[in-house]
C-alpha cells in the first residue's frame, strides 16, 4: 500500500460538498486552491479530485514532483491512472513549462515545499480549475528547507504564515488532518477578459482574432511605434498571466510577413523565458497562412523561424552582445541586469523590452525605475497590461499568491529627515507584524532586480542571520540582511576542498574551493546577503551608515564581507565603505547573468593577511586572463577591481627605451596600434601593479578594453558607449600619461 492512503474512505463525506463551488468557478473563470496536510493525504486528494471530475470530466492535468524521492513515482503513477491528459513534471525542470495552462495542478509536497515551485505551478492553473498541494507534514522533511538548515537548526516562520493566510482567504480549501477550513468565493466578483478589436486595425485582423484580451489587442496596434524611423524603445510590462509574450510573438509574425525587419533577435535569461514568443510567432504565421521554416536544437527547442527574407532567432544574452540585426527583443528584461540592457540600448536602434512586474522570476520594480530614467534619454513607449487571460480579473488565488509571497510588497513612503534609528529586528518580530514585514521585504525587492519567493522563505526560516533595519520617522527605509559564516572544522574545510557543497558558508566555500585558502575557513565572519535602501532615499549615505553599525555589532568577528553579481556602481559602493575585492568567479552565473564578486573588510590581523594575499592574486589573474576568462566583463569594472586590489607581485622593471620610442610613434600617428600592442600591455601592467598616478576611470577602462581584453575598437566602443575613434583617443591620452609617469 502507498504511504498516505486510507482505504477506509472515512474522509469522503468531508469533502463531498464542493461540486457547486467548482461549477461557480467555471462560470466565473476563477480558481480554487486546495492545501491538504494529513497522514491520509492520498484519500483526501482522491476524494477532492472525484468531485472536480463531476464538473470537468476530462481535465488537462499537470503533476509536479521530485521523481527520485522515495515513493514519489508510485504516487504519481496512481494519479496518472485517473486521467487521459496527464503531464508529470520534475520540479527541477519546471522552468521549461512556463506558459502552460491546465485545468488541474497537483503538487506532491511530501518531500519539498519550495516557494518558487509552488508559485510557478499554481500559476499554470487556468480559470475554472484547481491547484492541489498535498503533504503529510508541511513543516518537516523538505528538500529546500534542508538547504537552509545548519547544524540541525532551522525555523518555520514562512510555512506558519503561509498556512495562517490560507485559512483566512476565500476560495482556499484547507484540510489539516480532519479539520476543514473553507470560505467560498463567488463568480459575481470576477470579470473575464475579452478581446476588443479596433475599428480600423493596422495589424491584420487574423492576428487580432487570436487575442484573448483588449490589452493584447492594444499591444498589437501600439507596438507599431517601433517601426517608425529613428532610435526607439518599446517597453511592455505586466503581472504574470497577462499574455505579454504572446502579444509580442503575434506582433513579430506581422513584422516578418511585412519584411519590415529582416533580422530579429530574441534574448532572455534562459530560452524557456521566451519560448511563448516563438510559439505565438508560429500561431501568427499560421493564421496569416504564411509558409515558414523552423530551425530546432537537438532537444527540440525552436531556435529560429524563417519566412522569406525575415527571420526571428533566439540567442543567449552573452551572444546577443556581439550580434547585429534590425530589432532585438529582451524578454524578462527585469531579470537580466541593467548593465546588459545599457549595452544593448547602446548598440541597437530598435529595442523591445518585455518584463514581468510582481512576478516570481524577479521583481520588476528596479526595472521600472530604470525605464523612468530611460525616458529622458531615448524615444520610448511604455505599454502596461492589466487584464489576466489565464483566469478572470478578481481571481481569489492570484490575490492569495500576491499576499503570501509578497509579490507586490512596497516600502513605506517616507523621506529621510536626517535622523536614522538603526535596530536589530528578530525574524519572529518581523513575521508577527505583517505591515513591518511588507515594508522591509518591499525595500529588499525594490532595490534588487533578482528576487524570488524563495527569498521570503530564506528570510523567515534560515537561522544564524541578523536583520538590521534603519528607521526614519518610525518607518523602515533601509534593511541589511546578515548571515554568520566560517568558524569551520577541519573536516568541513576538507569536505569543501574536495568539492562537497556547503552553501550555508558561501564566502568561505568559494575561497576554500576555488582559491584553496583552507585556513580562511577557520575565521569567523559575517556575510551581508543584502543591503537595500528605499528608492527615494538612496544616495544619501544611509547604506554606509547601516554598514558601519553592522561593523560595530560584529564583536569577536574576523571579517565582514559580501558576494554579489559584478556591477560597477555596486562594487564602487563597497569599495567606498572600506571593502576590498578578493575574488571574481571564473565562470559566469547563467541564472544571475553575471560574474560573482566577493569583497571583504578585515576586522582582525589574521583576516587582513588573507585579504592582502587574495586580492593580490585577483589582480594578477585579471592582468593575465582578461583577454580570455573575462573578455565579456565591463572594462570599467576590471579597471575598478585592479585599482582597488593589493600588489604583492614583482614589479615589471624599467620601461625599455625602444618601448618608449614605439609608444611615442603611435601617439604621434606614425605607426598603428598593433605595432605597439606588447608595449602597451607592458605599460598598463606596470601601472596597475604600482599605481603611481590617478588615471581617470574612463582612460583606464579604454586601455583595459583594447589592451588587456583585446577588443576591437568597435567592440570596445560598444562596451564604453563611445565611437571607435573616441576609444583610440582615450587610449593614446592614457598611454601618454603612463609614459610620463613610469619611463
Curated annotation (Swiss-Prot):
The gene is tmcA. Keywords: Acyltransferase, ATP-binding, Cytoplasm, Nucleotide-binding, RNA-binding, Transferase, tRNA processing, tRNA-binding. GO terms for biological process: rRNA acetylation involved in maturation of SSU-rRNA; tRNA acetylation; tRNA wobble cytosine modification. It is found in: Cytoplasm. Coiled coil: none annotated. Acetyl-CoA binds at residues 531-533, 538-544. Its EC number is 2.3.1.193. This is tRNA(Met) cytidine acetyltransferase TmcA.
